[in-house]
């Protein structure tokens, strides 16, 4: 299989196929997508080393994968990576995966990857306050996008990011419970200082305050066992609580186990994992496919037109509430 075979099958010139692979910015979007579809159908694989020598680019996007934890909380990452890989392939890029235990280890991995594979860009996940990774990449002018807000730099972030509005998600969950008649609604989240966790707690607290209501909360590390323990403690502290909003499906699954016979308690999770679907857990759904597409779009724009300013370098996506039998 050669580039000439692809050109014949696509009904375009050999140069158009070459441009699609090596200089996609000069090819009309409709033509580029058509050629990429033919390439995928034929199973054509260009000589990556030769292409990199010609263009100085690897067409690789590197992203770290996080530990799976209890096997539930990390399942959102699987869906995000799948969507990221699909979308990147449509733009002519491939995904390079790596693992790292913390910021320092991840920065060391960046140096190794840049020396061995020369990725064109990076996608950061698990963003947090005082993120050393973002600062390191910014100092060196390396293209990257974060899936997650740069919590220490808001609202004037210095780099592109894509995120899901966690506060909007827990607000929707709390409003749903209020609409069902609940007035004593507790919250089980993570210890303060987590940007994501604080954001999700804020949506619950803000909604209750707007209805002149208050509520108990518990903060624990993520996990089913921790969620069960926190729920038991909260329900014992306030026998009037009839509903719980949780910062993750792992915590919510634990809360379901903490319910006692004769005391119905509605429970809502966050992430809409396969486990939530299996047990009928109402959960906040994150548009991970849309988030992955936005990440690739921001990176592709930066790589194909380095001097152009993207229409919006910061994308905050709204979640939705998937209602099941638990609430």
Whereabouts are the PLM-identified features?
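Short acidic/polar active-site loop segments enriched in Thr and Asp
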Residues: 13, 59, 120, 183-185, ...
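Hinge/beta->alpha junction and helix N-cap segments in small-molecule ligand-binding domains
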Residues: 67-79, 98-106, 162-172, 187-232, ...
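Short, well-structured alpha-helical segments in soluble
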Residues: 106-118, 227-239
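Flexible loop/turn connectors
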Residues: 237-327
